[in-house]
C-alpha cells in the first residue's frame, strides 16, 4: 500500500513587514493583538492542511479551543477577515472554506514538483495553466463527482480529499472512505453544481480550444461580481441569444446585477417580466417593430448575415 499523500507544508513564508499590510492592519485595529494572533494561527492551520481549510462549526469549535479564544470572538475576527478580503468571500459562501489567491500562489509554489497532488477545481482561484506550470504532475478533480474509471494511481490519491473531515483512518479503509465522503456531501452542492465551474462550462460549450487571455480575465471579474452560479446562468442566456461571446455574458450579467438580481431564480423572473412587457407593448402598438430580446442588452443593430 502506498504511503498516504502529504498535502500540507512544514513551513510557509511570512513577510517581515506583514503587519504593515492594509488588510492585516484593519484586523489588528479592530481586534487588537488577539485579532493579529488569530490571523497568523489561521494561516498556519491552512498551510499545514492544504491550500484551503474547511471552516464549519466543527472546525470553529476545535480551533477556538486550540488557540484558547472565545468562539464568538473567533467568529467575529474571521468574518472580518472575509469581509476585508484576507479570505475569498465567494468560496467561503459556497463551500465554507478559507483560502485566498495569495495563499494558493504561495502553496503551489512551495509544493513545486511533488510526485502527485490532487486539486479540487471548484476551490481554485488560480488559473489551471498557472497551477500546472508550478506543479506539472497535478491531478484535477471535481468536488461532487466520483469517476468510475479512476485509475489505480488516482484511487490512492482520492482519500486525501476527505482527510480534514474524517481524520486518520487505516490504509485498508482508504478507498471506502472516498465513497463515504462523497455520499455525505451536502445535497445542496450536488444539486446546484452538476457542471463544475464557469470556466469549464464555457470551455465545454463555447470555447472548445480554450479561453483567450482577455476572456479569462473578464471571466474572473464576472465571477467576483456575480458568483459562479449566476455567471453560468448568464452564459446560458448568451448561448440562448446565439451570441457566444464573453462580452455578451458580461452585458447580461451586469444587466441583472443593475436590477438587483442575486439568484438564478430572480434572473429568470427578470427575463420573464421583461419579455412580458415587450409583448404587451407590441400588442398595444402593432405598427412598431416587435422589440427583440437583444435590445435589452444594448447589442445594437441585429446582423442579417
Swiss-Prot record:
PANTHER family according to UniProt: PRIMOSOME, DNAD SUBUNIT
| The family this protein is said to belong to | Belongs to the DnaB/DnaD family.
Q: What S-S linkages are listed for this chain?
A: none
- Which organism encodes this protein? Listeria innocua serovar 6a (strain ATCC BAA-680 / CLIP 11262)
Q: What is the lineage of its organism?
A: Bacteria, Bacillati, Bacillota, Bacilli, Bacillales
Q: Which Pfam families does the UniProt record give?
A: DnaB_2 (PF07261), Lin1244_N (PF14297)
**Renumbered residue ranges of the record's region Disordered:** 267-287
Protein name from the UniProt record:
Uncharacterized phage-related protein Lin1244/Lin1753
What InterPro entries does the entry give?
DnaD-like_sf (IPR034829), DnaD_dom (IPR006343), Lin1244/Lin1753-like_N (IPR025400)
Domain of life assignment = Bacteria
Amino acid at each position: 500500500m502506498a504511503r498516504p499523500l502529504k498535502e500540507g507544508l512544514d513551513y510557509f513564508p511570512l513577510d517581515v513587514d506583514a503587519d504593515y499590510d492594509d488588510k492585516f492592519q484593519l484586523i489588528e485595529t479592530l481586534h487588537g493583538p488577539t485579532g493579529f494572533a488569530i490571523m497568523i494561527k489561521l494561516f498556519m492551520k491552512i498551510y499545514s492542511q492544504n491550500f484551503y481549510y474547511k471552516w464549519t462549526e466543527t472546525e470553529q469549535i476545535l480551533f477556538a479551543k486550540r488557540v484558547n479564544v472565545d468562539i464568538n470572538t473567533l467568529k467575529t475576527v474571521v468574518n472580518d477577515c472575509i469581509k476585508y478580503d484576507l479570505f475569498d468571500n465567494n468560496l467561503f459562501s459556497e463551500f465554507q472554506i478559507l483560502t485566498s489567491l495569495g495563499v494558493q500562489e504561495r502553496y503551489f509554489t512551495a509544493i513545486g514538483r511533488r510526485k502527485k497532488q490532487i486539486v479540487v477545481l471548484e476551490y481554485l482561484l488560480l488559473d489551471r495553466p498557472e497551477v500546472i506550470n508550478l506543479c506539472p504532475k497535478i491531478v484535477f478533480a471535481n468536488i461532487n463527482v466520483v469517476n468510475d474509471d479512476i485509475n489505480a494511481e488516482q484511487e490512492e490519491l482520492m482519500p486525501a480529499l476527505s482527510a480534514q473531515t474524517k481524520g486518520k483512518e487505516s490504509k485498508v479503509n482508504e478507498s471506502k472512505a472516498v465513497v463515504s465522503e462523497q455520499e455525505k456531501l451536502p445535497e445542496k452542492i450536488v444539486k446546484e453544481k452538476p457542471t463544475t465551474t464557469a470556466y469549464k462550462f464555457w470551455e465545454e460549450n463555447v470555447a472548445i480550444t480554450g479561453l483567450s487571455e482577455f476572456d479569462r480575465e473578464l471571466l474572473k471579474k464576472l465571477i467576483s461580481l456575480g458568483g459562479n452560479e449566476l455567471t453560468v446562468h448568464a452564459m446560458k442566456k448568451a448561448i440562448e441569444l446565439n451570441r457566444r461571446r464573453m462580452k455578451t455574458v458580461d452585458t447580461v450579467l451586469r444587466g441583472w446585477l443593475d436590477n438587483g438580481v442575486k439568484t438564478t431564480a430572480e434572473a429568470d423572473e427578470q427575463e420573464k417580466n421583461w419579455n412580458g412587457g415587450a409583448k404587451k407593448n407590441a400588442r398595444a402598438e402593432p405598427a412598431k417593430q416587435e422589440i427583440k430580446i437583444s435590445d435589452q442588452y444594448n447589442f445594437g443593430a441585429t446582423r442579417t448575415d
